[in-house]
């Protein structure tokens, strides 16, 4: 079967992992491809489009807002930048120079992964909590809520939390710590 990738000399693979960017993401449903094809025929104001997308994402997820990005790394970079700068365009224009801004992001050591490069590229200081290996035996464990709380100070902009199948502590506990810190 001849396809666009074979014409470029790229060998197709079988992706049994799911929507992983490094494996091409997910195969789009025909309705999605049709909508993209239709959208490509028009020019629109991107701010207005993002506003409409935000409303749709919020309505369907129950979140306060939403933002469409090109992938997970872009989403992490933009959300970290938003936590550091707020709505201040002067601060936005200074990035990755975060001097004088709330520029610390707290993260469990066991949550470290290649996506934290996107977070660090904003110019933040990554503050690690917990012990990285929770499977080795006595005295070795994952982060505890109190460790997140102890790491938060006046320069903390965010907590970077990665949800895995067995992530500890649970997200609700970390959110409670963040809200208690203000």
Which positions does each model-derived feature cover?
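Conserved PLP-enzyme active-site core in the AAT-like
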Residues: 2-23, 27, 54-68, 73-182
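A structural motif shared across PLP-dependent enzymes of the aminotransferase-like
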Residues: 21-33, 43-52
């Amino acid at each position: 079967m001849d396809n666009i990738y074979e014409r470029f000399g790229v060998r197709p693979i079988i992706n049994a992992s799911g929507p992983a960017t490094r494996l091409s993401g997910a195969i789009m449903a025909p309705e999605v491809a049709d909508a993209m094809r239709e959208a490509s025929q028009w020019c629109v104001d991107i701010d207005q489009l993002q506003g409409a997308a935000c409303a749709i994402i919020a309505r369907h997820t129950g979140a306060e807002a939403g933002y469409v990005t090109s992938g997970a790394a872009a989403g992490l970079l933009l959300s970290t930048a938003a936590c550091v700068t707020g709505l201040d365009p002067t601060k936005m224009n200074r990035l990755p120079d975060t001097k004088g801004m709330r520029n610390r992001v707290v993260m469990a050591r066991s949550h470290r992964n290649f996506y934290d490069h996107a977070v660090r590229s904003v110019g933040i200081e990554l503050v690690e909590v917990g012990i990285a290996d929770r499977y080795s035996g006595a005295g070795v464990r994952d982060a505890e809520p109190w460790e997140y709380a102890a790491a938060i100070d006046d320069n903390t902009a965010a907590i970077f939390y990665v949800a895995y199948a067995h992530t500890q502590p649970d997200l609700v506990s970390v959110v409670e710590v963040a809200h208690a810190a203000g």
